[in-house]
Amino acid sequence: PLLIEITLNLAIYNDKRSFIERDAEDVLPKVIAAQKVLKEIRKDVEIDAYIEHVNYNFLEQHGMHVDIILDATDNFDTRQLINDFAYKHQIPWIYGGVVQSTYVQATFIPGETPCFNCLMPQLPSINLTCDTVGVIQPAVTMTTSLQLVDALKLLTGNKVNKHFTYGDIWTGDHYTFGFSRMQNEDCKTCGNAPTYPHLNQHQQDYATLCGRDTVQYKNADISQEILLSFLERNHIQYRTNLYMTMFRFREHRIVAFSGGRFLIHGTTEPKKAIQLMHQLFG
């Protein structure tokens, strides 16, 4: 039998593009809702869920012994981080992206294919993100289907086609082309002298989340206990459960997780989000 351990690290809130959490409670983080539904489908599969931001430390802690990495992210900074990590540790990773009605997919295999960074300069159009143009569900379905086919091939020892797939579900266009010759010998990830520049431990404490009018902020010194005590002392109404605490401050909805991670809704400006956090906690 094939033993598969699945690690989930997803966005926090329910999204109408996602089928997986349709029966889960709205108050649950998406990653927990996904874990719950998947366990109901396959009780014999072990599924670990992490309500964390993917950064260098997360990958070093949880990604060292995986067989493949399946990309479901929505920004290129995280993909470049995954790309460096995957090539440093010789782990195949499967890229997938969606913009409006277009879909893109490619599987990167260290030692066999050029990496994500080698491919990027040839494809400037895929630098658009859902933050500015949005997506439609059929394009999401097409992307994930292509990714899952390659994942099944890798897990079962079958040959993966080393090509890049691009298409538009709206117009019906679909293209594939090989990218083996795109390797850059000077690439800092897969070239002759790799330095893996995106694998640094000094990550920013904030990030704007794609298409969500939200800024993520992290301060490890603010535990859930400290937060709840602060909210009680200042008579700020809040809701809390095992996973997160939700409250409002100056017309902004704020969601806090263990480990000092906060989502500040209602702004895309990190500077404004940081000011709000300083007003709250000094």
Specify the residue positions occupied by each region the protein language model found.
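Adenine nucleotide-associated cytosolic modules
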Residues: 1-282
